Amino acid sequence: MQWIDDGLVIGLRKHGETGVVLELMTPEHGRHLGLVHGGRSRRMQPMLQPGNTLRATWRARLDGALGAYAVEPLTLNASRLMDSGLALYGVAHLSALLRLLPERDPHPALYEAAQILIAHLDDPEIAPALMVRFELALLAGLGFGLDLSHCAATGANDALVYVSPKSGRAVSASAGEPFRDRLLPLPPFLRDRDQPGSGWRTPDTHDVREGFTLTGYFLDQHVWRPRAQDTPEERARFVALGTGQS
């Protein structure tokens, strides 16, 4: 068995005296592990850092085996990201989110979203809002997507300012007003599908904070609490730095 794909480094662990088990997020083969012989050498270590993108060739005798990687560098982001505390926590949180996906289950859209996020993680004006969007996309990839397109009560697609914590659906201002204390905020930038570089306007800190409140609630309900986990420290630190709460 053999395939070649690009891969974002999201983790590694020691294997034997000189090797590592490398965990990549790939567009065509999903989250995939493989052994890198000599991966702990001085030559290889800088390449195998979380946040880097590699060209990977995976080989194994059987499809279900761990297999081995041969890798070469494509985009080495780690050295750039190391200069930013926000970026370091961002890489750690992004990697932890991607590790929630089932192994070898392709999610090409999430891979592309992760690459966009990595490219902007050291930009404090953009990175926090992109992380909120990525968390929404990750929830959808896990089967817990939110419906923010129209009001759950009226079907209207304007004045959407709340989200129901029970259904994960948007609620309009008029329909939600009597229940506002029981609803989650829907910040305006999550209704805007534009992307950076094409007229996308950076949301203010208050809106980003509300975005993290929204995604954090559903991540807690569907991901962390069922696993008996608290909110990961790397997320808490990223949110604090990204919203001026540190």
From Swiss-Prot:
Listed as disulfide-bonded, the cysteine pairs are none
Q: State the UniProt keywords alphabetically.
A: DNA damage, DNA recombination, DNA repair
Gene3D superfamilies assigned to the protein according to its UniProt record, in alphabetical order: Nucleic acid-binding proteins, Recombination protein O, C-terminal domain
GO BP terms: DNA recombination; double-strand break repair
Key word DNA repair present: yes
Coiled-coil region(s): none
User: From which domain of life does this come?
Assistant: Bacteria
Q: Which GO terms describe its cellular component?
A: bacterial nucleoid
> Does the keyword field hold Ligase?
no
**What InterPro entries does the database record attribute to this sequence?**
ARFGAP/RecO (IPR037278), DNA_rep/recomb_RecO_N (IPR022572), NA-bd_OB-fold (IPR012340), RecO (IPR003717), RecO_C (IPR042242)
Family membership: Belongs to the RecO family.
Q: Which NCBIfam families match?
A: reco (TIGR00613)
Record function comment: Involved in DNA repair and RecF pathway recombination.
What name does this protein carry?
Answer: DNA repair protein RecO
Origin species, per record, is Methylorubrum extorquens (strain PA1) (Methylobacterium extorquens)
High-level lineage: Bacteria, Pseudomonadati, Pseudomonadota, Alphaproteobacteria, Hyphomicrobiales
